[in-house]
Amino acid sequence: MPGHLLQEEMTPSYTTTTTITAPPSGSLQNGREKVKTVPLYLEEDIRPEMKEDIYDPTYQDEEGPPPKLEYVWRNIILMALLHVGALYGITLVPSCKLYTCLFAFVYYVISIEGIGAGVHRLWSHRTYKARLPLRIFLIIANTMAFQNDVYEWARDHRAHHKFSETHADPHNSRRGFFFSHVGWLLVRKHPAVKEKGGKLDMSDLKAEKLVMFQRRYYKPGILLMCFILPTLVPWYCWGETFLNSFYVATLLRYAVVLNATWLVNSAAHLYGYRPYDKNIDPRQNALVSLGSMGEGFHNYHHAFPYDYSASEYRWHINFTTFFIDCMAALGLAYDRKRVSKATVLARIKRTGDGSHKSG
């Protein structure tokens, strides 16, 4: 395994955590130290079966004017209607029953975990493994979130990591806050996104029947889980008004989930410190982490995309890590990959911006 030693830390018999330890600085040959030069994007990866989310600094944008934007008017209209409906939903919150507000919040949390613990840390990055009951829960939660099916989301996200801040990055933050937040969903993909994304190895997800099942039945799935169910449950179960159910539990909740996720692509790439790698754009943003339940420690995540915690500090403003650890305690999650403290400190010293408390 290039550049790393693996140690298996056994907690209970059903739970393992793979810890990444820093490699030796060189190897001895004929009594002398032979220094090996290893590209940074290969030096710190620990998954021999997974390279598609590792940053490739050799890729550069082609020179020349960017292609003309092609607006997707269907998406523009639907997003506008959603957010107008969500704003109206805010005015209805005071008239909602307490159960409706609690239901909307729980639905929000489950949806966020379908993104953070599900399509992001499990399926996009393979930072841990999940047994079938947990995978079923996460695929349902991901469908509730309605942010494209797991296969498409993971393909775009792997391209985002591998070709970060280039035209092959689906939500390139160097094209501005609005584009990286939501604008990328309102226009046709840049040709480089299609070209490079189409060449990524997605065989792991193609081989997973659950992921392909969701993709096959995604449209009826989102209609049921994202819109029909959250509207009918408050209305039918505790007599909430239909308008409150639709505008608060459905539209407002859905809009909040979307924007909490989008802020990881926009704000967490533009605002904050870069204690782990000052040479990349992603930042540490605690407010983003609060809304996304752990995805805002973005400089760390792009430096170590294979760490299941997506943060140096595990449970600190990181409910998703807490959730995964709880699932591990129940025997539903295992092989959680974790970067060792020594490796983190070495990276801070080598490429950090000096803002880390370790100095």
Curated annotation (Swiss-Prot):
Gene Ontology CC, one term: endoplasmic reticulum membrane
* Sequence intervals crossing the membrane: 73-93, 98-118, 218-237, 242-263
The kind of enzyme this is, by top-level EC class, is: oxidoreductase
Q: Where is the short sequence motif Histidine box-1 located?
A: 120-125
> Which amino acids does the record list as binding Fe cation 2?
160, 269, 298, 302
Which compartments is it annotated to reside in? Endoplasmic reticulum membrane; Microsome membrane
Q: Where does the chain bind Fe cation 1? A: 120, 125, 157, 161, 301
Q: Where is the composition biased (Low complexity)?
A: 11-27
Tell me its EC number(s), please.
1.14.19.-
Required cofactor names: Fe(2+)
- Output this protein's name: Acyl-CoA desaturase 3
